[in-house]
Amino acid sequence: MSDLTELTAEDKANVLVEALPWLQKWHGALVVLKYGGNAMVDEDLKRAFAEDVVFLRTAGLRPVVVHGGGPQISTMLDRLQIPSEFRGGLRVTTPEAMDVVRMVLTGQVGRELVGLLNAHGPLAVGLSGEDAGLLRATRRHAVVDGEPVDVGLVGDVVGVDPRAVVDLLAAGRIPVISTIAPEVDADGNPLHGQVLNVNADTAASAIAVALEAQKFVVMTDVAGLYRDWPNRDSLVREITAGDLAALLPSLESGMVPKMEACLRAVRGGVPRATVIDGRQAHSVLLEVFTTSGNGTMVVP
C-alpha cells in the first residue's frame, strides 16, 4: 500500500508498533545526513526529506544535515555564462566560479532547505564550513592520465571544529551545513581569507566523525551499492569496512566518493554508515525506523 490514506486503522497502528523498537534504540542519537541527488531537485522529495528530518528531531534524535549542490551550481554558472568544466572528476573552480559556488550553496540551497524545515517550526539554522571555523581545507589537484592537474579553488577537508554544531544541537536546533571551507596551510593557519569548494560527501563524513555520530546516512540516486552494476540482483544490504575497501577499485565512478565517505566514517568511529535511495520519498524514515531498512549499510 503506497498511500497511507489507504491503510486501515489497524494497519496504521501496526506501522507505529514496528517503529517502536527503533524509536527506543535511536532516541537521543546524533545522526548526520548527507542531503543530495534527486532529493535536492524534485519538489516533492525536498518536502518529504524535510518532513523526515523534522520527524527525527521530534522523535528525540539529533539530526545534522550536510549538503552540496552540484546541479544548482552548474545551472547558475550556465545562467551567468561562466565557463565550467570537470577534470579528473573535479569541477575546475576559478575565483569567479567560487563566488557562484559560495552564493549557491549558502545562499540558495541551504536557505531553501532551512525554509522547508522551518515550515514545521523554528528548528533549523543554516551555516557553512566558514562559520566558527567549522571546516578547514587544503588545496587538492585532480589526476588525469596519472598526472596532477590544477583545478583551482578545490580542497580536501583536513580539520573539523564541531563546537558550533554542538551548541546548536544543545539548543534543540537542526544544523544545516553547506560545504565550503577556509583554506589553511600545512600548519592549519588560514591563508588570506581564501575559501575552497570541497566534496560534500567527504565533508559530511568528516563532520560525522568529529561529532561522534551514531549514524551516518548518504543519499544517492540508486538503491544502494551493487557488487556487479547494472545487475540489480547484486545489491548489497550490508558490508564490512574491510570488504568495502577491497571492492572500491571496481565500483562505478559515481559511487566511489559516497562509499569512500561511508568507509572513512566507519573507520573514524561511526558505528554504521548507510547509502540510501533518495529517489524514494521518506527514505530516511524507512532506513531509521523500519526493520527492513533501506539501501546498503557499512559496518566495522
Curated annotation (Swiss-Prot):
Keywords: Amino-acid biosynthesis, Arginine biosynthesis, ATP-binding, Cytoplasm, Kinase, Nucleotide-binding, Transferase
Reactions mediated catalytically: N-acetyl-L-glutamate + ATP = N-acetyl-L-glutamyl 5-phosphate + ADP
Record's subcellular location: Cytoplasm
Annotated GO CC locations: cytoplasm
Site note Transition state stabilizer, residues: K34, K258
Function description: Catalyzes the ATP-dependent phosphorylation of N-acetyl-L-glutamate.
NCBIfam families, A to Z: argB (TIGR00761)
Listed name of the protein: Acetylglutamate kinase
Organism: Kineococcus radiotolerans (strain ATCC BAA-149 / DSM 14245 / SRS30216)
